[in-house]
Curated annotation (Swiss-Prot):
EC number(s) from the headed UniProt entry: 2.7.4.25
Record carries keyword Lipoprotein: no
Highest taxon above the source species: Bacteria
Keyword Transcription regulation tagged: no
Record Pfam families: Cytidylate_kin
Coiled coil: none
UniProt keyword list: ATP-binding, Cytoplasm, Kinase, Nucleotide-binding, Transferase
Family: Belongs to the cytidylate kinase family. Type 1 subfamily.
Name assigned to this protein: Cytidylate kinase
Catalysed transformations (reactions): CMP + ATP = CDP + ADP; dCMP + ATP = dCDP + ADP
Residue sites binding ATP per the record: 12-20
Length: 229
């Protein structure tokens, strides 16, 4: 691990806004960005495409080690794009079903082990903003600033509904709330790397906060610690 490159971790449940905040923070600082959830979504998506059983740990571990993936950085006019085996799968990975598959494979110890070093390889100068569910507890336990971002299940479902409304047929607020609660249950109860705040994490409830308010609070913590120089 490159100790010269500081890491800020942002963990939290599905729909808490951690991906949005991490992206904005990385852009503001000019740092690298790790969307760890995308790696699990990629693996689950690739497994389904290759006919790999989502409960077969050894096959998933092998697939994880050889994922042909590229992350194309965001630009002023375009968001980050994710290329799997030569195809742009960015939009496919946002599908709720892919998210459910990702949660399933993320509970497997062999899969998490296979992706651990791949995630740590993102730590490069000038620094890294890493978002996920175990960034501060497992992947980067020595990070100088750890954020645990949450929001009520109802608010997270509402945010997701607004994102999907008009884009996905048949989406309902009640079904999204059920999915989020089920996802929370899987993520917090899994035996390996369960979703929980690191002991030294700063916990932020974004239920009644705007994106900019959350970002400003994190920037204040960065300034206090003089992390970004």
């Amino acid at each position: 691990m490159n100790i010269k490159a500081p890491v800020i971790t942002i963990d939290g449940p599905s729909g808490s806004g951690k991906g949005t905040i991490a992206g904005k923070l990385a852009k503001h600082l000019g740092w690298c960005l790790l969307d760890s959830g995308a790696l699990y979504r990629l693996l689950a998506f690739a497994a389904r495409n290759h006919g790999v059983d989502l409960t077969n740990e050894e096959s998933l571990k092998l697939l994880a080690a050889h994922l042909d993936v590229q992350f194309l950085g965001a630009t002023e006019n375009h968001p980050q794009r994710i290329i799997l085996e030569g195809d742009d799968v960015t939009d496919d990975l946002r599908n709720e079903q892919v998210g459910a598959w990702a949660s399933q494979v993320a509970a497997l110890p062999a899969v998490r082990d296979a992706l651990l070093q791949r995630q740590r390889a993102f730590q490069e100068p000038p620094g890294l903003v890493a978002d996920g569910r175990d960034m501060g507890t497992v992947v980067f336990p020595d990070a100088p600033l750890k954020i645990f971002l949450t929001a009520s299940a109802e608010e997270r479902a509402r945010r997701r509904y607004l994102q999907l409304k008009g884009k996905v047929d048949g989406v309902s607020l009640s079904s999204l709330l059920d999915e989020i609660r089920a996802r929370d249950e899987r993520d917090t109860q899994r035996a390996v790397a369960p979703l929980k705040p690191a002991a030294d994490a700063i916990q932020l409830d974004s239920t009644e906060l705007s994106i900019d308010q959350v970002l400003q609070r994190i920037l204040s913590e960065i300034a206090i610690r003089d992390i970004a120089g």
